[in-house]
A protein has these predicted regions:
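A short, flexible loop at the N-terminus of ABC-type nucleotide-binding domains that lies
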Residues: 3, 12-25, 56-62, 95, ...
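ABC ATPase nucleotide-binding domain
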Residues: 5, 27-29, 69
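Short, conserved post-Walker A segment of ABC-type ATPase nucleotide-binding domains
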Residues: 36, 47-60
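ABC nucleotide-binding domain signature
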Residues: 37, 79-86, 100
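The feature captures the beta-strand-to-loop junction immediately N-terminal to the Walker
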Residues: 39-41
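Conserved ABC transporter NBD signature motif
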Residues: 63-77
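Q-loop/switch helix immediately C-terminal to the Walker
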Residues: 87, 94-108, 120
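Conserved ABC ATPase "signature" region
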Residues: 116-132
């Protein structure tokens, strides 16, 4: 059984000036207990594809997929899954306060206002005893 199954994944970045298709209809799967790698040229969409599956792309990216399933269950991007970045410096930006980084993620995932995202970020930090 595949742990992760992704079918017909498309990612398009939208702006007022242009529309850029970063990922065009890719399929991939990861089998439980196996190491899976996605390889390709620089700029071919490897990181964009994984960030799309995890729900970590910003609000300017349109993500569509025929299927994203985790252990056979259809999931919304980012639910019940995590990603470990190869470069640990990409996990958190040391030049940006943690509250802002959390708020940006909340805003992108929940499609809410900046004020709502900031409030949620503060609630999350309070819940684990981190001063903001």
């Amino acid at each position: 059984m595949n742990m992760l199954d992704v079918r017909s994944l498309y990612v398009t970045y939208l702006s007022e000036e242009e529309r850029v298709e970063a990922v065009r209809g890719i399929d991939f799967s990861a089998e439980e207990g196996k190491v899976t790698g996605i390889v390709g040229e620089s700029g071919s969409g490897k990181s964009t594809a994984m960030l799309a599956v995890m729900g970590l792309l910003d609000h300017k990216a349109a993500v569509e997929a025929e299927k994203v399933s985790l252990f056979g269950n259809t999931v919304r991007a980012g639910d019940n899954a995590a990603i470990i970045f190869q470069d640990p410096l990409k996990c958190l930006n040391p030049t940006v306060k943690i509250g802002r980084q959390i708020a940006e993620t909340v805003r992108n995932r929940k499609k809410c206002t900046w004020r709502e995202a900031k409030k949620r970020s503060e609630e999350l930090l309070d819940s684990v005893g981190i001063r903001h």
